[in-house]
């Protein structure tokens, strides 16, 4: 499966950029892993069942 995330550079804002970064973070972290039981999610090791993350930059 492919998840596409787009950053709109036509009318950028701090909120859109923050949302863009959150979407990337939410789609690459392995929720079953955390850093030293701190509750901080980490990126999981690659597997043969991984999905792809497609990042688009929309410009004028």
Swiss-Prot record:
SUPFAM superfamilies: Ribosome inactivating proteins (RIP). The keyword Hydrolase applies. Its EC number is 3.2.2.22. Keywords: Antiviral protein, Hydrolase, Pharmaceutical, Plant defense, Protein synthesis inhibitor, Toxin. Gene3D superfamilies: Ricin (A subunit), domain 1 (3.40.420.10). The keyword Disulfide bond does not apply. GO terms for molecular function: rRNA N-glycosylase activity; toxin activity. It catalyses: Endohydrolysis of the N-glycosidic bond at one specific adenosine on the 28S rRNA. It is an enzyme of class 3 (hydrolase). Belongs to the ribosome-inactivating protein family. Type 1 RIP subfamily. This is Ribosome-inactivating protein dianthin-32. It comes from Dianthus caryophyllus.
């Amino acid at each position: 499966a492919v998840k596409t995330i787009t950053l709109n550079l036509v009318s950028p804002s701090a909120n859109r950029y923050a949302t863009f970064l959150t979407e990337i973070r939410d789609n690459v972290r392995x929720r079953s892993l955390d850093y030293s039981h701190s509750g901080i999610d980490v990126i999981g090791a690659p597997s043969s069942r991984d999905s792809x993350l497609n990042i688009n930059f929309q410009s004028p």
